């Protein structure tokens, strides 16, 4: 199974575990006890290979991480947990960080023109080009 969970600054173990269950089962989860929730996750992941994406993680509390990850250890070898974060400390805490570099300004400009103007030719909109270039500069 593949699961994507938006974490943000609310690293609530119960909520995240519920989100995983709802993604795995495609059903609303009305359970609230963390132990019960984790049994359900374990049952759904045991002997299965999975990909779990935890997007925009901010929490640096290693005890919460350990509690959250407990039922995830039952997946098959090859299962992966991908964590996106802006925090170097979190990246190092959860495993093997891969720092991503930004896209160069020329590539941003090319993409922006295609999205904003419908093509890579901004020539039809010279009055907007200066504003668009300022926006692109901020995207980095």
Question: Could you tell me what each predicted segment is?
Answer:
Residues 35-103:
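A conserved switch/coupling segment of P-loop NTPase cores
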Residues 8-9, 73, 137:
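Tandem alpha-helical RNA-recognition repeat domains
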